[in-house]
Design a protein with these regions (language model features):
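Acidic, Mg2+-coordinating active-site environments of NTP-dependent enzymes
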Residues: 50, 138-301
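Structural beta-sheet core signal
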Residues: 113, 132-134, 168, 192, ...
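A generic structural signal for short, well-ordered alpha-helical segments in conserved domains
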Residues: 65-69, 263, 365, 413
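Phosphate-binding loop of NTP-binding sites
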Residues: 4-189
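Buried hydrophobic packing segments
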Residues: 68, 72, 92-96, 259-269, ...
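Short, charged, surface-exposed secondary-structure boundary motifs
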Residues: 90-91, 141-148, 198-206, 339-340, ...
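Short, basic, glycine/proline-bearing loop/turn elements
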Residues: 103-110, 138-143, 263, 299-304, ...
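ATP-dependent carboxylate-amine ligase
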Residues: 1-30, 160, 189, 267-275, ...
Length: 426
């Protein structure tokens, strides 16, 4: 009962904020409660009978978490999780306000949480996750993290706080370093997942992990591995298992990595109750996470939304553009504090853009002029630009495609009334 006053205040704040800003504003109540009742988070999560599972890394957290949660739920377990928009510390408090009781009790079997790589270590040390899955370390937000080694160090702290098993990407040298450090602790269990080199078409660019500037470590044997990847389907092997043709929510080898990580994580969570066929069918039926290959019908026509957050995700999404993306809106928002990273991407697959917009729209237009990507207009007023773009005549072939950074994504989705992150269909 000691948390009751803080929870009541937090819920009141949540209602008031939602009245002012539908579909947003969940961070403020969580922030207030985290100051008034800092012990609530650990108290709520550590009482869950199945413990806490953490999924973290630079990219792919939202999709991997959604996949793992869906698999475990299909096995009959109730899972507490956080929306991908609430993956920092106050977001966890906000999720408890929404889904917990007035005393902070969570009536679930276990928690599977997506955690921002900068916040995960602080939270993990308090809640002691049973299982942690670390997806990757990519070059991202240099203004925030300075050096990828700092991210690796933070993720290593999460791994060290894990009580049962740490799942790592065996193709990422940063994850191999984390695993090497963990191996000095005899009681620590480590599992490896990844994409086999032979699974990738020679024309595909490999996933670009952050450099370590250290001697390369030998790759580990992958326990759960993607053995083939074609279009939007994968096959994978795991100990005693071989599964063919799992459909991914969208095209791209990053989705293949998310799927194999989710499969490996769910198998570790469920143990001998894990049903591989059920897991595969669950993955095949899942829609994408919002704005990650999400397709919406607007004005009677399909529009695809693609989120790009850093050089690797921009590159992967551009490489997977097809002729379906025949009319493109490209928006870079104020979240890109250092637009110079835009120049590190190969834009050869982006031949023509209709509209360039966003807080950093002029920077993007300058970039396109430099690299030779044709564009029809620059409109820095984001909401006016998206309205004008969506009002264009339907393309004669393909569909309208919106490529945007996180800030532009949030503003556009709110403007279009897409306030529920779970309201996505396949």
């Amino acid at each position: 009962m000691i948390y009751l006053p803080a929870i009541l205040l937090g819920r009141l704040l949540r209602v008031l904020v939602r009245m002012v800003r539908p579909g947003g504003g969940s961070a403020l109540p969580g922030l207030v409660v985290s100051k008034l009742a800092p012990g609530l988070l650990a108290s709520s999560l550590r009482r869950l009978p199945g413990g806490v599972v953490v999924i973290t890394g630079t990219a792919g957290k939202s999709t991997t978490t959604k996949m793992a949660v869906a698999i475990v739920r299909q096995h009959g377990y109730s899972v507490f999780t956080n929306p991908s928009t609430a993956n920092i510390e106050q977001g966890f408090y906000s999720s408890i306000l929404k889904f917990g009781s007035l005393t902070g009790k969570l009536d679930y079997d276990l928690a599977i949480l997506e955690m921002d790589e900068a916040h995960a270590a602080t939270v993990a040390k308090r809640v002691k996750p049973r299982i942690t899955s670390i997806l990757n370390v990519l070059v991202d937000q240099v203004d925030r993290f300075v050096d990828p080694a700092n991210v690796r160090e933070k993720l290593g702290e999460v791994a060290a706080a894990t009580t049962q098993k740490v799942m790592l990407n065996g193709k990422d040298q940063n994850c191999l370093i984390i695993g090497h450090d963990l191996s000095r602790r005899p009681s620590q269990q480590i599992g490896w997942f990844g994409i086999a080199d032979e699974a990738l078409d020679a024309q595909l660019k490999p996933l670009k992990y952050a450099p370590t500037y250290l001697p390369r470590l030998a790759e580990q044997n992958l326990e759960t591995v993607v053995t083939s990847y074609r279009d939007s389907a994968i096959s994978l092997n795991a100990p005693g298992l071989q599964i063919e043709n799992i459909e991914l929510p969208a095209k791209g080898q990053h989705f293949a990595l998310d799927a194999v990580a989710a499969f490996a994580t769910a198998r570790e969570v469920l143990g001998n109750k894990f049903d591989a066929a059920l897991a595969a069918s669950t993955l095949s039926a899942l829609p994408p996470v919002f704005a990650r290959g999400e397709v919406r019908e607007i004005n009677g026509e399909p529009v695809e939304f693609i989120l790009v957050q850093n050089p690797p995700s921009m590159q992967l999404n551009l490489d997977n553009l097809t002729s379906d993306a025949s009319q493109i809106f490209f928006a870079i928002g104020r979240d890109v504090h250092d637009p110079s990273w835009l120049y590190s991407v190969d834009y050869s697959n982006l031949r023509k853009v209709h509209t360039v917009s966003g807080f950093n729209g002029a920077e993007a237009a300058l970039l396109f002029s430099f690299v030779g990507v044709e564009f029809e207009k620059l409109q820095v007023d984001l909401l006016q630009a998206i309205d004008e773009f969506l009002a264009l005549p339907r393309p004669t072939s393909g569909r309208k495609t919106v490529i945007f950074s996180a800030d532009a994504m949030r503003r556009i989705r709110r403007h279009l009334g897409f306030t529920d992150p779970e309201d996505v269909t396949k």
